[in-house]
């Protein structure tokens, strides 16, 4: 039952339906912003592609996968009968609206019986897009849903027909697949839907509509279907309770509260076998900001003490209170290359994290600009295809788009981005004990500016570099110590808390504005004489809870220890050294006149002796000269010995 040769007359392609109401079809699919305006392109989501039968508003196929918004474009499989349903059956279609004398009672297409399913395998089909009617051929009207968006030839962009319809701008290609079911008891008309390059670059905020038509003698039946994308996070965040910013600013918990308590069962004396009791699972307790800061410093100390105990005998570790709070050290490491998203890709923070300070030289992936080539000791161009590069444990990829534990090569190749493998360290500076004491010393002498070192420079490369160094020296066990892992957990907890605080602070702006407006209204009724401000406003009073008492107590104890140390210094100081602490100009005066005084003293001590020796030397030289002058006036007489012959 093959139709006439292409093209068929325009009138053969006309089918008058009542206008299909697409209210149930064009469903509003909310775009997932994942809690921020610009999510990281390497963020892995649960992406579901849904193919919907438009006429019946039923789901024909749903395919889910884990991936980024750039590479999560799988090959979709759907059966033609799932797209058609019962819409091609004679009992459903209205013969009164059918033109040119076609009668559906004698039609051999549809999915009602097994014979019709088999017959449908012989019909070619073509697909016309309805999401962009303006992209059709010039001077051609492709019609609407009642025409399947194929009112004229040239509107088709894909399909399985002898003239091989193609397009350079449509989002999908639809071809016929192979079926193993020869009896057609179930589905035997598989279709394969693949995304084109234009489809991978398109915005899928809402469903896209297409029309599919069979190529046969007479009227070509229509099937409308839509393709939509649904994006969801792996573990959607949950918020509970009131404002999460201010109430959690509590003092540090005591040391005894951090220890885990394990309940032990009393031994049984009746000889029966003790039953295993499942431990009760309790929800993790939310720690405060001060606990997180203390954990960062404590974890840094334990890691430094494990690597170099001599440096922790007497030192100060100071947590930097101004941005940047973290710094990255570029390292060389072996990353894992996987085709499926590893578990580390599924726990990416919702907010972008930017590292403003990266030092050292390490491994770089992608196209590195000249401005950042100094960070690269080894550069790799990456891999082709949909691969995921997971950083080693305790390390991250620092990219143009932010910090991420793993990167997608599809995103990296598409955006021309580059990444550097780094270790993440908190901004904790290392100082000698004298540095802190000088800030509380009352002496007026100006000391030289001390040199501050961050712990990251002292411990840089511990995660990956320590492995290579530990093979021959036996220090690899350092990487598995609880001290280093505690520092990593403390940094991860602090980053997670920072992320939650940013979201909660945004929600707290409303509460802050209410307090400001309340104060403004209080100024308007300044002369109110009864009831006070809160009673006049008939609102709850706002108070400020001051928790700085603990800080004042700690500073008082610190000043007391400094005072005792200063007294110890004074008791060991000599009387001459105490002169320099009397007055600020005394040190300058002594240093100015000390040189001339020493020269004058040396002249007075050794001058007479040197002068006497010089006078004596001159006298001796004069005597020698006088003797020479006198001998020049006389001649020596030759002596004669008479005894000699």
Curated annotation (Swiss-Prot):
All ranges on the Extracellular side of the membrane: 37-589
Residues with attached carbohydrate: 46, 61, 270, 305, 310, 334, 337, 377, 393, 413
Transmembrane intervals: 590-610
Motif position, CXXC: 315-318
Fusion peptide, as annotated region: 451-471
Region (Disordered): 238-283
Cytoplasmic side: 611-645
Signal peptide segment: 1-36
PANTHER family: BC035947 PROTEIN-RELATED, VIRAL ENVELOPE PROTEIN
Subunit: The mature envelope protein (Env) consists of a trimer of SU-TM heterodimers attached by a labile interchain disulfide bond.
Physiological role: The surface protein (SU) attaches the virus to the host cell by binding to its receptor. This interaction triggers the refolding of the transmembrane protein (TM) and is thought to activate its fusogenic potential by unmasking its fusion peptide. Fusion occurs at the host cell plasma membrane. The transmembrane protein (TM) acts as a class I viral fusion protein. Under the current model, the protein has at least 3 conformational states: pre-fusion native state, pre-hairpin intermediate state, and post-fusion hairpin state. During viral and target cell membrane fusion, the coiled coil regions (heptad repeats) assume a trimer-of-hairpins structure, positioning the fusion peptide in close proximity to the C-terminal region of the ectodomain. The formation of this structure appears to drive apposition and subsequent fusion of viral and target cell membranes.
Domain notes: The 17 amino acids long immunosuppressive region is present in many retroviral envelope proteins. Synthetic peptides derived from this relatively conserved sequence inhibit immune function in vitro and in vivo.
Protein name: Envelope glycoprotein
């Amino acid at each position: 039952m093959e139709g006439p040769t292409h093209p068929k007359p325009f009138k053969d392609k006309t089918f008058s339906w009542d206008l299909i109401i697409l209210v149930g079809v064009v469903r509003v699919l909310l775009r997932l912003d994942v809690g921020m305006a610009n999510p990281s392109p390497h963020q892995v989501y649960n992406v579901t592609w849904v193919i919907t039968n438009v006429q019946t508003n039923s789901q024909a196929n749903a395919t889910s996968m884990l991936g980024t918004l750039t590479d999560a474009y799988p090959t979709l499989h759907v059966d033609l009968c799932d797209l058609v349903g019962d819409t091609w059956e004679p009992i459903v279609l209205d013969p009164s609206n059918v033109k040119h004398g076609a009668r559906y009672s004698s039609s051999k297409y549809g999915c009602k019986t097994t014979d019709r399913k088999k017959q449908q395998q012989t019909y070619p089909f073509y697909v016309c897009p309805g999401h962009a009617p303006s992209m059709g051929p010039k001077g051609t009207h492709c019609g609407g849903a009642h025409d399947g968006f194929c009112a004229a030839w040239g509107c088709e962009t894909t399909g399985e027909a002898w003239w091989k319809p193609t397009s350079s701008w449509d989002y999908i290609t639809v071809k016929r697949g192979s079926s193993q079911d020869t009896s057609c008891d179930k589905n035997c008309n598989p279709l394969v839907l693949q995304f084109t390059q234009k489809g991978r670059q398109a915005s899928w905020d809402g469903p896209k509509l297409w029309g599919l038509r069979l190529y046969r003698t007479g009227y070509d039946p229509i099937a409308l279907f839509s393709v939509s994308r649904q994006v969801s996070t792996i573990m959607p965040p949950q918020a509970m309770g009131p404002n999460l910013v201010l109430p959690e600013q509590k003092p540090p918990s005591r040391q005894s509260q951090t220890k885990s308590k394990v309940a032990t069962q009393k031994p049984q004396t009746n000889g029966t076998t003790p039953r295993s009791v499942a431990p009760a699972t309790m929800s993790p307790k939310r720690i405060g900001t001060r606990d997180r800061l203390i954990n960062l410093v404590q974890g840094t100390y334990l890691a430094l003490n494990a690597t170099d105990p001599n440096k922790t005998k007497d030192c100060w570790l100071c947590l930097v209170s101004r941005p940047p709070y973290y710094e990255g050290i570029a390292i060389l490491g072996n990353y894992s290359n996987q085709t499926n998203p590893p578990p580390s890709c599924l726990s990416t923070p919702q907010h972008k994290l930017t590292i403003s300070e990266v030092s050292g030289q390490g491994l770089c992936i992608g196209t590195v600009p000249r401005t950042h080539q100094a960070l690269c000791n080894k550069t790799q161009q990456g891999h082709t295809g949909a691969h995921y590069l997971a950083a080693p444990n305790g390390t991250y990829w620092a990219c143009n788009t932010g910090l991420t534990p793993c990167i997608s090569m599809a995103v990296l190749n598409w955006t021309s981005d580059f990444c550097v493998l780094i270790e993440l360290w908190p901004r904790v500076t290392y100082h000698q004990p004298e540095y802190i004491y000088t800030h509380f010393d009352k002496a007026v002498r100006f000391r030289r500016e001390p040199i501050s070192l961050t712990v990251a420079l002292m411990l840089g490369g511990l995660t990956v570099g320590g492995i290579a160094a530990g093979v021959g020296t036996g220090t690899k066990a350092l990487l598995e110590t609880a001290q280093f892992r505690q520092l990593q957990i403390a940094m991860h907890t602090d980053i997670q808390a920072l992320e939650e605080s940013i979201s909660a602070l945004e929600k707290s702006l409303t509460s802050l504005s209410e307090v400001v407006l309340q104060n403004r209204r209080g100024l308007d009724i300044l002369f109110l004489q009864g009831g006070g401000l809160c009673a006049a406003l008939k609102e709850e009073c706002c108070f400020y809870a001051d928790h700085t008492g603990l800080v004042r107590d700690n500073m008082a104890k610190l000043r007391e220890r400094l005072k005792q140390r200063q007294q110890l210094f004074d008791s060991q100081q000599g009387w001459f050294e105490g002169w320099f602490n009397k007055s600020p100009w005394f040190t300058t005066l002594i240093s100015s006149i000390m040189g001339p005084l020493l020269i004058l003293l040396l002249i007075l001590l050794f001058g007479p002796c040197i002068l006497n020796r010089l006078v004596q030397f001159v006298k001796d030289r004069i005597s020698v000269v006088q003797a020479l002058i006198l001998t020049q006036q006389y001649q020596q007489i030759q002596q004669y010995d008479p005894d000699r012959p």
